[in-house]
A protein has these predicted regions:
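Bacterial Sec-dependent N-terminal signal peptides
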Residues: 1-28, 555
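Detector for intrinsically disordered, low-structure N-terminal pre-sequences
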Residues: 6, 12-14, 38, 49, ...
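Intrinsically disordered, low-complexity segments enriched in glycine/proline and serine/threonine
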Residues: 6, 80, 439, 559-560
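Prokaryotic Sec-type signal peptides and long signal-anchor helices
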Residues: 8, 16-21, 66, 74, ...
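Compositionally biased regions
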Residues: 19, 161-163, 485-491, 544-547, ...
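Extracellular/luminal regions of secreted and cell-surface proteins that mediate adhesion/ECM remodeling
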Residues: 534-588
Length: 588
């Protein structure tokens, strides 16, 4: 268990420290009793078996990734400016959850355990996604995918998504690892449909794929392009949200898909009372590990900004989805529950998509009005937790400083009401923007978050931070870590579109994050980092608490805080220290 221990030390040194603290404000929740709405459509999915990558290579049908690929798009995604009301909404000043005193001491962050590049492409943006499984890391981008061994070495050649889905493939992939089933999942858009594949076994390199498609002439979007699809795993289905009018939530029949049953179906819903700003990307909570909740009561989450027309105060909306595969008439989605939040401003540049300055080139898209990939769910012995984030403008002046507003929700048990356990806004050091976040929780409840960062003097970089479960609520308490720094700038305002962080199922501790950077072409880099300790006993000094200012005398009482990074509780331990190369002193 992680705990702080105040320790009094007698030392001879000059120290100047200034520590500020920020209190978290609790806000009342305002749940509404939900009414339910029925499923809109049910369709049969088209099924085919597709051979493994190794089989395709052997029989000559393998379609390699095109290094010069350009996305085969329908209507370009994220091109409609957000519909905001100028001057409307709170806060009128800086983000109230930001601690702008970045000199505050943070806990030490470990260096990345592993970094490796998954692709170097010319497509814009690269759409990085990846999930770590028990035996492989599955990476995908734009219109291609590849398996890697867990040491970062390639396990297969890079393959075109067409090798799974054929010519009806339009990119925007999302990949998943279904921990309970020990299977790998690959998805992409079709021209006006969805493509979905799950590995036949836990060996996706040598065994084949169950591939499903929602036929274009049946897909319930009225011919609309299924823009910006985001997938999640829940106990009773594979869930997908899209940026479409009308039906924008789709559920695929997980139980049948896992066994390659050709009678698998898809159900679709129109999300009630979701206020949009012109673009919308809500997400169903995705199960982090193999510990699934009871079937049913999947939760859909989306932000509601009072800068948008039709929203009177900043809040989070939650919908509950229940699917009955035997009798679709019983399937339903609830009216939303509303959770009041601390005021935030998610609008950049009046809702346009050229936002964040680089050292040169176009201002890049902050990806506003979006629950970032993915909203994650984890069961613990005493509660369930959900974590998610979205980008906000933390600067209350005419300038802009992108930060990441993040949340942990909790419920007492499966199907129980959600409440806000903690909320925070993270900003990067040195005046850099922090955006394009992806976050999750490990087995101890520690939160890890990867993100992108950029400024007028520094090109895009991929970075990470996090917090221990026992830390002060609402703060990312770990120092910022660096995964990779770009050597060039983006030549387009389109950047990344999303990133992806997953948790290693072999130890339930390591966070695997993938994002876009420039080397000098658009490239995707994976960074692996860990917060939880591997040692049973591991302590370290994290702050000097008193005195915080002034000059010390020849003999002075100094109080420091020591943090238990280890897995076990400790007490009555010795503390040793050394000042300016002097003798080592031990306090007992």
């Amino acid at each position: 268990m992680n705990k702080f221990y105040p320790v009094l030390l007698m030392i001879f040194v000059f120290i100047l420290f200034s520590l500020n603290t920020i209190a978290q404000t609790k806000f009342p929740q305002s749940p509404e009793k939900p009414d339910t709405f029925k499923v809109t459509n049910t369709i049969n999915l088209e099924y085919k078996y597709v051979a493994s990558i190794n089989e395709q290579i052997q029989n000559g049908t393998f379609i390699p990734a095109d290094p010069n690929e350009f996305k085969r798009q329908g209507p370009p995604k994220r091109m409609r400016a957000n519909k905001v009301v100028p001057g409307k909404g709170l806060p009128k000043g800086d983000d109230p959850l930001v601690d702008f005193n970045l000199t505050k001491i943070k806990k030490q962050t470990r260096e990345p355990i592993l970094t490796f590049q998954t692709t170097n492409v010319t497509s814009t943006p690269s759409d990085p996604t990846g999930e770590v499984g028990r035996d492989y890391y599955l990476a995908s981008w734009n219109s291609s995918f590849r398996f890697f061994n867990l040491d970062g070495s390639p396990a297969t050649p890079a393959a075109s998504l067409s090798s799974l889905f054929g010519p009806n493939e339009s990119g925007d992939p999302i990949v998943l690892y279904d921990g309970e089933a020990d299977r790998y999942v690959i998805s992409s858009m079709g021209s006006s449909s969805l493509n979905f594949a799950v590995s036949v076994s836990n060996d996706p390199v040598n065994d084949g794929w169950h591939v499903y498609n929602a036929a274009s002439n049946q897909f319930p979007t009225g011919g609309q392009f299924p823009d910006y699809p985001k997938y999640s795993i829940w106990s009773d289905g594979y869930y997908c949200t899209t940026n479409t009018g009308g039906d924008n939530l789709f559920v695929l029949e997980r139980e049948k898909i896992l066994i390659g049953d050709s009678s698998a179906t898809l159900q679709s819903f129109d999300t009630p009372s979701m206020v949009q700003s012109g673009f919308a990307s809500a997400q169903i909570l995705d199960i982090v590990d193999d510990n699934h909740p009871e079937a049913g009561n999947a939760t859909l989450v989306y932000l509601q900004d009072d800068s948008w027309g039709g929203v009177s105060y900043d809040h989070i909306k939650l919908w509950t989805v229940n699917v009955d595969w035997n009798n679709p008439a019983n399937s339903s989605i609830s009216n939303p529950t509303e959770l009041a939040t601390t005021a935030f401003n998610s609008v950049f540049d009046g809702g346009n998509f050229s936002n964040l300055q680089q050292p040169s080139g176009s201002d890049i898209d902050a990806v506003q009005a979006t629950i970032m990939n993915q909203a994650q769910f984890r069961k613990f012995a005493t509660h369930n937790s959900a974590v998610f984030n979205f980008v906000v403008d933390t600067d209350g002046t005419a300038g802009e400083l992108a930060g990441i507003r993040w949340y942990e929700l909790r419920q007492d048990g499966d199907g129980q009401p959600w409440t806000i356990f903690q909320e925070g806004t993270y900003i990067a050091p040195d005046g850099r923007h922090a955006f394009m976040g992806s976050m999750s929780m490990d087995l101890q409840g520690n939160i890890g978050m990867g993100y992108s960062s950029v400024s007028t003097s520094e090109s895009v970089s991929l970075r990470y931070t996090g917090r221990y479960a026992a830390d002060q609520l609402g703060e990312m308490t770990l120092e910022e870590g660096l995964i990779t720094q770009s050597s060039a700038n983006s030549n387009s305002f389109r950047y990344s579109d999303y990133a992806h962080l997953s948790v290693d199922p072999t130890n339930d501790k390591q966070f695997w994050f993938v994002g876009e950077y420039f080397s000098p072409n658009r490239s995707n880099m994976v960074g692996v980092f860990q917060i939880a300790a591997d040692a049973a006993y591991d302590t370290g000094v994290v702050s000097v608490d008193s005195p915080v200012t002034g000059t010390l005398t020849d003999s002075e009482s100094v109080t420091v805080s020591i943090f238990n990074y280890g897995e076990n509780d400790i007490s009555n331990f010795d503390v040793s220290f050394q000042v300016d190369g002097g003798a080592v002193v031990t306090e007992t």
